[in-house]
């Protein structure tokens, strides 16, 4: 099997599973494997998942060690934004806050796709217990989430931020908040074209920032601002 064929096989099967069956695996299934074979929870999970995906190639099955991860929800619940920013206050005719959740053992993408020696490795995670994450709805449709994927994929940009930071797009202000908490960041300029999002942020979220004085918001299109700058 070529690497391209391998990549297509893994990506296509996982895509279907994540879209349609992400919460199929449950604690009872895990315990059956653990009790019968003495495997760990993670080992049992990977056995069940590769069986559901009908993957029989032993080399690919072994590679799921680099694809599937058991996550510790306390790591994400200890995140500064998660702990300190209360989104429950958001409420209007258009905007509404609520908690969504991942069920125990529900599979989801928690980090970026990796490529090693021309082989693609998705980052699939699960929690052993229910994990709740904040979600803001716009006209009853999901607008912005703060999930483990958001937290993980922002780690490097946040760690590299220093001095006077410029970022395009406001969202729920996760990136802006996290970099504003750094001592080596002097200011955070955010370019956002949607005035309603800016108003939402200024009314409900910015007042909760410890270092709100570092924040400057420019109401403009990112491409227009880049050209002017």
Language-model-detected regions and their locations in the chain:
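Conserved class I S-adenosyl-L-methionine
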Residues: 160-173
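Active-site and NAD+-binding cores of ADP-ribose-processing enzymes
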Residues: 119-123, 155, 215
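Conserved SAM-binding loop of SAM-dependent methyltransferases across substrates and taxa
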Residues: 172-184
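Structural motif
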Residues: 165, 183-186
């Amino acid at each position: 099997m070529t690497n391209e064929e391998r990549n297509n096989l893994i990506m296509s099967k996982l895509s279907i599973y994540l879209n349609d069956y992400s919460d199929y695996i449950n604690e009872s299934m895990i315990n059956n494997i653990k009790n019968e074979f003495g495997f760990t929870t993670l080992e049992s999970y990977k056995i069940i998942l590769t069986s559901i995906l009908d993957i029989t190639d032993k080399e690919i099955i072994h590679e799921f060690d680099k694809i599937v991860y058991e996550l510790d929800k306390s790591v994400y619940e200890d995140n500064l934004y998660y702990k300190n920013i209360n989104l429950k206050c958001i409420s209007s005719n258009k905007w509404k806050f609520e908690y969504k959740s991942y069920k125990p053992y529900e599979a989801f993408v928690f980090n970026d796709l990796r490529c090693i020696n021309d082989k693609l490795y998705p980052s699939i995670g699960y929690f052993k217990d229910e994990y709740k994450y904040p979600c803001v709805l716009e006209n009853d449709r999901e607008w912005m989430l703060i999930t483990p994927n958001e937290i993980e994929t922002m780690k490097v940009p946040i760690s590299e931020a220093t001095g006077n930071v410029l970022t395009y797009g406001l969202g729920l202000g996760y990136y802006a908040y996290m970099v504003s908490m750094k001592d080596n960041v002097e200011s955070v300029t955010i370019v956002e074209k949607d005035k309603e999002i800016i108003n939402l942020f200024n009314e409900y979220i910015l007042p909760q920032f410890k270092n709100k004085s570092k924040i400057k918001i420019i109401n403009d299109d990112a491409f227009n601002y880049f050209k002017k700058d």
